Regions:
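Low-complexity, highly charged intrinsically disordered N-terminal segments
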Residues: 1-44
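Acyl-donor binding region in acyl/amide transferases
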Residues: 33, 42-172
């Protein structure tokens, strides 16, 4: 298999991602770069990657760095993978999520992001969609490229599944 990494316009990327994944591709303030990964022999899209400005506060990251970083400096040198999504069945059959994560850590992507933002990125971070509730993550086994530094914490409620939503809506 051969792959190409193509930077996409927001609207096209968002439409394709929304048809593939179970969430809406909402925008965050700050930097954003959107890529699709295609298998070149079949011209099939096998994954989506969206980079953006890192989260302002992340306890595992702050613990790893020893303190809350100076955000002006940190935001110039760090980038976050917000959506790292393989299409199916490529994701399951060929460990597509690991390929997408490895692409995020590649020198080619780093060069493109450095050029786009006129900086030198030295940290890539991401969070796992399901945390540890499934007993594993697609990022497991990615060392030395990605290292687990702890679970993030949130006070947001999980999104309700499609099955229970109508029942709860009627109840309320």
């Amino acid at each position: 298999m051969n792959f190409s990494i193509i930077q996409m316009q927001s609207k096209t990327f968002d439409t394709l991602l929304e048809m593939t994944a179970s969430f809406s591709p909402d925008e965050n303030p700050g930097k954003t770069a959107k890529y699709i990964v295609k298998e070149t022999n079949t011209n099939t899209v096998v994954g989506f990657i969206r980079f953006g400005s890192p989260l302002i506060n992340s306890k595992p990251r702050n613990d790893y760095l020893g303190d809350v970083p100076d955000l002006d400096i940190f935001n110039k040198r760090a980038i976050m993978g917000f959506n790292i999504v393989p299409t199916q069945p490529f994701g399951f059959n060929y460990l597509g999520g690991k390929l997408m994560a490895a692409i995020c850590c590649s020198s080619d992507i780093r060069r493109q992001l450095n050029k786009k933002y006129d900086t030198e990125f030295c940290l890539f971070e991401t969070t796992s969609l399901y945390g540890n509730i499934k007993g594993g993550s697609m990022y497991d086994g990615m060392r030395p490229y990605l290292r687990y530094k702890g679970d993030t914490q949130s006070k947001f409620l999980l999104t309700l599944g499609e099955e229970i939503y109508p029942e709860l809506k009627a109840w309320f």
